[in-house]
A protein has these predicted regions:
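Alpha-helical transmembrane bundles and membrane-interface segments of multipass inner-membrane proteins
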Residues: 1-156
Length: 156
């Protein structure tokens, strides 16, 4: 089982490590220099916010019971995705691994910080997209790969 899923585990580990390192750097910078709000170019800012919801701040709760329930639900979904990754192959396995790696990064923050640090702020002509993090990038890419794989299955 390990040999068959080796690449999947490598992708999970890469996603998790890149996410953790980026968040540690951003949080340390913010703790050292105060609020982080830095423009890197006309389209990209670094702006640390703490997200108590899920992707893009959705389902943010003040009630701790709902927050804990949501965290356990996310852990359950990660376990289901891991099971699906074991049963998949090829590009689909990479899609599941990418989603799992990003999800593990975000759920780790939920457990240790009770929120997820988001800091990548894309904008164009004053329109700002939702602030996100490296884990969200891996989750999004993984979902895109899985959607692509589903379309390829339907063509056959």
């Amino acid at each position: 089982m390990i040999k068959k899923n080796y690449l999947g585990f490598v992708i999970i580990l890469i996603a998790f490590i890149l996410d953790r390192v980026s968040k540690i750097l951003i949080i340390n910078h913010s703790n050292t220099f105060g609020k982080l709000d830095m423009s890197l170019n006309p389209f990209l800012n670094l702006n640390l916010i703490w997200n108590e919801g899920i992707a893009f701040g959705l389902f943010s709760f003040d009630e701790k019971n709902y927050y804990n329930l949501l965290t356990f639900l996310i852990i359950g979904i990660i376990l289901v995705l891991l099971w699906l990754m074991f049963r998949s192959s090829g590009l689909e396995k990479l899609g599941f691994a990418s989603v799992i790696g990003g999800s593990l990064g975000n759920v780790t923050d939920r457990i240790f910080y009770s929120s997820v640090p988001d800091f990548i702020d894309l904008n164009y002509n004053g329109f700002h997209w939702f602030v996100f993090n490296v884990a969200d990038i891996f989750i999004t890419l993984g979902v895109m790969i899985l959607i692509f794989c589903e379309f390829k299955k339907k063509e056959k």
